Design a protein with these regions (language model features):
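Short active-site alpha-helical segment characteristic of glycosyltransferases
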Residues: 84-91
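Juxtamembrane/interface motifs at transmembrane-helix termini
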Residues: 93-94, 121-122, 137-138
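Catalytic beta-strand/loop signature of glycosyltransferases that borders the donor
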Residues: 56-58, 96-106
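Residue-level signature of catalytic and energy-coupling elements of molecular machines
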Residues: 67, 92, 102
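Acceptor/aglycone-binding surface of glycosyltransferases and processive sugar-polymer synthases
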Residues: 2-82, 108-119, 123-127
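Phosphate/oxyanion-binding loops and surfaces in catalytic or ligand/nucleic-acid-binding neighborhoods
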Residues: 46, 50, 95, 136
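C-terminal, non-catalytic tails of nucleotide-sugar-dependent glycosyltransferases
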Residues: 128-143
Length: 143
C-alpha cells in the first residue's frame, strides 16, 4: 500500500531512522494470508515486541523507510528473503536509532506465486530473532 509513503516521510522528518509499516497496530490489517504464514509472522512479532526492547509490533513486515545514515553505518549480512528487515531492526535497536511505526493494510497477492519460503529462510530469521532478544536479555552491545 503505497498510500502511506507520505505519512512515513513525515515520521522520517520527525527524526526516525526506521519507519515501519505495521499490520498489527490500530488501523493496520492483514488479509488473505495463509494460516501458517499468519501464525509465524504474528508470533514472531508479538514475542519480539513483548520480550525484547524492539519498539514495534510488526517486526516481519519489510515495507520500511530507512535513513541514509542508517544504511551507511549498519552492515547488512542477510542473504535470503526478508531477513534483512529483521536484521536491520535488531541492529538499529541496539544502536539506539529511533524506530517508529505507522498502520498499514496488507493483502496477500491475488496473482502469481508467493516468494515467501519459510523453511529456506527460517535459519536466517531465527538468527536475527535471537539477536533481537539478546539485546534485552543478555545486554549485548556488539554489532
Amino acid at each position: 500500500n503505497f498510500n502511506i509513503l507520505e505519512e512515513m516521510y513525515k515520521e522520517f522528518k520527525n527524526g526516525s531512522h526506521i519507519v515501519a509499516a505495521s499490520r498489527f497496530i490500530k488501523g493496520g490489517s492483514m488479509k488473505g494470508c495463509p494460516f501458517i504464514k499468519s501464525v509465524l509472522v504474528r508470533s514472531a512479532s508479538f514475542t519480539l515486541y513483548y520480550l525484547s526492547s524492539i519498539p514495534i509490533k510488526d517486526a516481519s513486515n519489510g515495507f520500511r523507510l530507512f535513513s541514509r545514515k542508517l544504511l551507511n553505518e549498519v552492515n547488512i549480512e542477510s542473504k535470503v528473503g526478508f531477513a534483512y528487515s529483521l536484521e536491520l531492526l535488531a541492529k538499529c535497536n541496539r544502536l539506539k536509532y529511533k524506530i517508529t511505526e505507522i498502520p498499514a493494510q496488507w493483502e496477500e497477492r491475488s496473482e502469481g506465486s508467493s516468494r515467501f519460503k519459510v523453511f529456506k529462510w527460517l535459519p536466517q530469521y531465527l538468527k536475527w530473532y535471537i539477536y533481537g532478544l539478546s539485546t534485552t536479555w543478555l545486554r549485548k552491545k556488539k554489532i
